[in-house]
Amino acid sequence: MKVWWAVLAAAILAGCRAQTEQEVEVPEQARWKAGQPWELALGRFWDYLRWVQSLSDQVQEELLSSQVTQELTMLMEETMKEVKAYKSELEEQLSPMAQEHRARLSKELQVAGALEADMEDVCNRLAQYRGEAQAMLGQSTEELARAFSSHLRKLRKRLLRDAEDLQKRMAVYGAGAREGAERGVSAVRERLGSRLERGRLRVATVGTLAGRPLRERAQAWGERLRGHLEEVGSRARDRLNEVREQVEEVRVKVEEQAPQMRLQAEAFQARLKSWFEPLVEDMQRQWAGLVEKLQAAMPSKAPAAAPIENQ
């Protein structure tokens, strides 16, 4: 029984080790890598979310903490800050235009509220998943992982839909603004371009500083976990070899002692036979003597009974 437990433990450790040695891939969303500052900030939020999902279960369990929720909240606030800054700059630079253009801009940017709600939903879902994982300890980790992946897929679809909608609306309005600028607002376009460039640089700097420590920590966790699993696997293999050697020694001893045990059993059987055979013979002799006495006594009693019947 101990041998089977040791084999099962070694198989589980080997599976965990194979899972942790897979390369962590961080998918890239090309469509958010260039464009407005809010698009770059949204790309950072998107990449971080996909990166957390791509990690192994062990590293995910460590990363799904309040710190990750805070990092996502920071990226979400950075994205909405850039969207609001872009809206304020457009309103400031387009103030000479008609009032209906500014009203149209405010109406078009209302979709940014839906985008913010979706990003907040992502953070809330991560916190909910962490609580469910703690409450469902002892159940299958595969079921938790499937539920987590399903939540993220749905949230990514909503996030992508609202982001694309906002991008299309901003592109349409930006095209109108460029046409107006070409008709005489070239100064506005120059100032807006310089501010957008500064926003791109700021978002790129924030993204680099935010992403580098997380990747370094994840790599360090992966290395520590891999080393620990290798050490445990080595100890399990050594213990398994020791158990196999002990079982082999017991088997050899049993094979060596089997003939001796058979001889001892035969000798004990002969001894029992020698004990009981005299008793059986004595009982047979006594029984035969008793039968003879009974047979001898029966004829002597029969004539004595006849005179009694005649009277």
From Swiss-Prot:
Its main location: secreted. Heparin binds at L155, R156, K157, R158, G222, E223, R224, L225, R226, G227, H228, L229. GO terms for cellular component: chylomicron; extracellular exosome; extracellular matrix; high-density lipoprotein particle; intermediate-density lipoprotein particle; low-density lipoprotein particle; multivesicular body, internal vesicle; very-low-density lipoprotein particle. Residues 74-248 are annotated as: 8 X 22 AA approximate tandem repeats. Residues 203-283 are annotated as: Lipid-binding and lipoprotein association. The keyword Phosphoprotein applies. GO terms for biological process: acylglycerol homeostasis; cholesterol efflux; cholesterol metabolic process; chylomicron remnant clearance; high-density lipoprotein particle assembly; intermediate-density lipoprotein particle clearance; lipoprotein biosynthetic process; melanosome organization. APOE exists as multiple glycosylated and sialylated glycoforms within cells and in plasma. The extent of glycosylation and sialylation are tissue and context specific. Sequence repeats lie at residues 74-95, 96-116, 117-138, 139-160, 161-182, 183-204, 205-226, 227-248. Residues 151-161 are annotated as: LDL and other lipoprotein receptors binding. Belongs to the apolipoprotein A1/A4/E family. Homotetramer. May interact with ABCA1; functionally associated with ABCA1 in the biogenesis of HDLs. May interact with APP/A4 amyloid-beta peptide; the interaction is extremely stable in vitro but its physiological significance is unclear. May interact with MAPT. May interact with MAP2. In the cerebrospinal fluid, interacts with secreted SORL1. Interacts with PMEL; this allows the loading of PMEL luminal fragment on ILVs to induce fibril nucleation. This is Apolipoprotein E.
